[in-house]
């Protein structure tokens, strides 16, 4: 039985990956640092198949032992806040330490790292810089590394629409950060999890970068219009200049429960679409599902 370690497995994407990979019969180990329900994770597979456990850091003897015996390591772990520690520490240094442990594992077949679209171009964001540094380090230090750069991931329970929909339900006026012209190319979570399944099942070798996006490119204004249309509610979109938005979000970040932070706000400043230079779903014969249909289904539910 192939053994897979998934960092960040307790999150939205992680649970979908666990559910799909468990159906393939793999043993799945889910290390976690933040409080999570181990019982709910175990229920994603058959008895004894999913093994969640708490670890403080990568110096933990148990995690080191597991990492030296696993066949596949998937890292979804990331950070959106640098309040307590820098992005370089939480993202790059974590991946650096992780790879240095994995290099001692002769059984390891693949390292799969979840990145994001445009991290190689966004020099303003310290988070993007840390992620891109991690990409380069992983690719340079392991011969079978697969980097996945997904668009904004949609599906039941996703973080993006889960944040937007409550605002649309209660407010007639919807803030539109910037001019609303920046574009995004969302992708369905089932397509992303299928991509990972095929990478693992096919024992894909070599270094690869996949840009995982859906077929539809939308501006944020177009997306907002679709949401209001599918909700059957008339909404007025109020452009909010980025300077003002940053000032307001900066103030909100002082409080513990800010709905959005400056790093997340930066996504609205640039296009978040495929560059046509890396591999995509077609490489593994996957046809991504229509993103507008996914938005409609999520809104209607």
Predicted regions and their residues:
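Conserved beta-loop-beta element that borders a ligand/cofactor-binding pocket
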Residues: 136-166, 170
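Mid/C-terminal beta-alpha module of Rossmann-like enzyme folds, strongest
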Residues: 198-261, 274-301
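Conserved glycine-rich Rossmann-like NAD(P)H-binding loop of the short-chain dehydrogenase/reductase
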Residues: 26-34
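NAD(P)H-binding glycine-rich loop region in Rossmannoid oxidoreductase-like domains
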Residues: 35-40, 44-97, 101-103, 117-121
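N-terminal Rossmann NAD(P)H-binding glycine-rich loop of SDR-like oxidoreductase domains
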Residues: 4-26
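Conserved catalytic-site region of short-chain dehydrogenase/reductase
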Residues: 82, 117-129, 153-158
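SDR active-site strand-loop-helix element
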Residues: 7, 31, 73-77, 111-117, ...
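Substrate-positioning beta->alpha
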Residues: 159-161, 178-201, 208
